[in-house]
C-alpha cells in the first residue's frame, strides 16, 4: 500500500486567476449547468407541459376573441384556462431551474399531482360548460375543443405524475 502523494484535479485554482495551468484548456462546467437543467426540455414530461400550455393558450384566445353573451360561463372558462396555464408554467420553471433542490420542504411530485387532479377536474367542467353554451359559434366551439384537448393532456400528466410518485415511493420502501 502506497501512501504517496496523488494527483488532485480541481476546476478552479486555489491561487490567483493566473495560477498554474491558467492558460491551459481545462474542461470546466458552464456557469448555467448548476442552475439550468438543460436536459429537461427534451423529456416527455416537459414536452407534455409545453403541449398543455399551447393548447390552453389557444383555448383562451379562441374564447376571448369570439363574441359571447353568457358572461359567467365563458369568464369561468377563461379563468380556469389562464390559472391552469400559469400553474403549469410554474411547474415547468421549477423543473427547468431546479428549484426543487432549493425548496426541499415541498413535496414537488405530490404538489404537481394535486395540481393536475384539481386543475383537470376544473378544466373538464369548464370545457363541458363552454361546449354546451357555444351556440354554434366557431370560436367558442374551437375553444371548447382545445379545452378538451388540454384536459386529455392533463390526464396524461396525472398518469405520468402518479406513476412516478408510486414507483418512487415503492422503490424507497423496498430499500
From Swiss-Prot:
InterPro entries linked: Marvel, MARVEL-CKLF_proteins
Organs and tissues of expression: Highly expressed in leukocytes.
Protein name per UniProt: CKLF-like MARVEL transmembrane domain-containing protein 7
Coiled coil, from the record: none
Keyword Chloroplast appears in the UniProt entry: no
Location of this chain's protein in the cell: Membrane
Keyword set includes Membrane: yes
A GO cellular-component term linked to this record: membrane
GO MF: cytokine activity
A single BP term in Gene Ontology: chemotaxis
Topology of the protein relative to the lipid bilayer: Multi-pass membrane protein
Record keywords: Chemotaxis, Cytokine, Membrane, Transmembrane, Transmembrane helix
One Pfam family here: MARVEL
Family: Belongs to the chemokine-like factor family.
Residues annotated as domain MARVEL: 40-166
Domain of life: Eukaryota
Residue stretches spanning the membrane: 43-63, 77-97, 110-130, 140-160
Amino acid at each position: 500500500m502506497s501512501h504517496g502523494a496523488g494527483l488532485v484535479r480541481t476546476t478552479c485554482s486555489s491561487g490567483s486567476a493566473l495560477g498554474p495551468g491558467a492558460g491551459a484548456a481545462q474542461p470546466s462546467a458552464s456557469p448555467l449547468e448548476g442552475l439550468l437543467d438543460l436536459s429537461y426540455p427534451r423529456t416527455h414530461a416537459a414536452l407534455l407541459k409545453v403541449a398543455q400550455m399551447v393548447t390552453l393558450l389557444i383555448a383562451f384566445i379562441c374564447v376571448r376573441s369570439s363574441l359571447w353573451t353568457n358572461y359567467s360561463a365563458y369568464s369561468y372558462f377563461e379563468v380556469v384556462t389562464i390559472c391552469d396555464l400559469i400553474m403549469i408554467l410554474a411547474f415547468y420553471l421549477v423543473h427547468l431551474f431546479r428549484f426543487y433542490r432549493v425548496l426541499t420542504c415541498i413535496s414537488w411530485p405530490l404538489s404537481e399531482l394535486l395540481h393536475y387532479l384539481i386543475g383537470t377536474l376544473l378544466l373538464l367542467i369548464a370545457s363541458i360548460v363552454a361546449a354546451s353554451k357555444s351556440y354554434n359559434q366557431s370560436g367558442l366551439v374551437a375553444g371548447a375543443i382545445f379545452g378538451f384537448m388540454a384536459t386529455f393532456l392533463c390526464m396524461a400528466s396525472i398518469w405520468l405524475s402518479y406513476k412516478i410518485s408510486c414507483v418512487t415511493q415503492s422503490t424507497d420502501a423496498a430499500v
